[in-house]
């Protein structure tokens, strides 16, 4: 079974874009697809966005996200991912690892 990692922009978005990650996770789940994401726990349950910038330490968040990414077989890129340095890094890692890539606004690569 293929597990997807959801990647997308977070910084400079309200609530760190968690609502978009939650929506994408729900769509994948409804399609019978297993997924991991920085806005979900390891069981796929939505996490609450950090309340303050002090709660959102991006380096730690990136470390946790990369740990999830390497457990997956494919990556699903949310709209706007090209503007995010972290999502760009996740994308490049996924390509290097030979993961299937899908794009929220385009389909599969």
List the predicted regions and their residue ranges.
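Conserved catalytic or regulatory cores that recognize and/or transform ribose-phosphate-containing ligands
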Residues: 1-109
